[in-house]
Regions:
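Membrane-embedded alpha-helical signal segments
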Residues: 1-223
């Protein structure tokens, strides 16, 4: 399953693919899911812990527990993963597990930009929650998420997000090269990073936009 997913899915930092081998029985389990979309506590409680303890035949658990559904069509794998399902392969059979984690309850309203129409919620300071929001707003297997760190001391984490099918390769390379050329010790805000990427104090036409609106991010990805 994991080898096939590497072919049909775009590479993404948030796509977790694990092969787990039981230390006593030697049985193997393959597991795949998008980290921002799922509740890892559910993964541990329903999959990894029962498999490792082996107190009950794991195949019996997969077949008897209503949280697991047998998947017979590989064409549905991508959609299931993008909808917050975890995929499990055990003894040459594929099962899906609903581990969806998706909530807007802790989000604040957008401050940088207001909108009369569309969602009023902004991104979260927690990058995993923000990636959850973006993946739910832009449900596509072509969405690529790359992680980088900037700042020699701060090692500030950032994510480059783009649609592999629609992205302008030249622009993507330009952004990657500019990010790689940032050599400050501390990067503490998006505004500071924007000034470093622009390279100029004043520009006749803007080339970068800072936004926290979900609808604008989805629209930008779709171009």
């Amino acid at each position: 399953m994991l080898d096939r997913l590497k072919i049909i899915l775009s590479p993404a930092e948030d796509l977790i693919q694990n092969e787990i081998q039981h230390p006593i029985t030697g049985q193997k389990l393959e597991l795949a899911y998008f980290l921002p979309l799922i509740d890892e506590q559910k993964i541990h409680a329903f999959i990894t812990v029962p498999f490792s303890k082996n107190e009950y035949p794991f195949m019996n658990l997969l077949k008897s527990n209503p949280n697991f559904t047998k998947v017979t069509d590989p064409a549905t794998w991508t959609d299931l993963l993008l909808r917050g399902q975890a995929l499990i392969e055990f003894q040459d059979q594929i099962f899906s597990f609903d581990a969806m984690k998706f909530s807007y309850t802790d989000l604040s309203e957008a401050n940088l930009e207001t909108s009369i129409l569309g969602p009023q919620n902004s991104l979260s300071e927690d990058p995993i929650i923000s990636l959850n929001i973006i993946r739910n707003a832009y449900v596509s297997p072509e969405l690529v998420i790359d992680k980088m760190n900037v700042g020699n001391l701060s090692r500030t984490g950032l994510y480059i997000i783009y649609d592999q099918r629609k992205v302008n390769k030249h622009t993507l390379d330009l952004v990657m090269n500019k990010l790689a050329s940032v050599h400050l010790d501390l990067i503490q805000s998006t505004g500071q990073l924007e000034r470093l990427l622009n390279g100029k104090k004043y520009q006749l036409f803007p080339t970068l936009l800072i936004t926290e609106r979900i609808d604008r991010i989805g629209r930008a990805l779709s171009f």
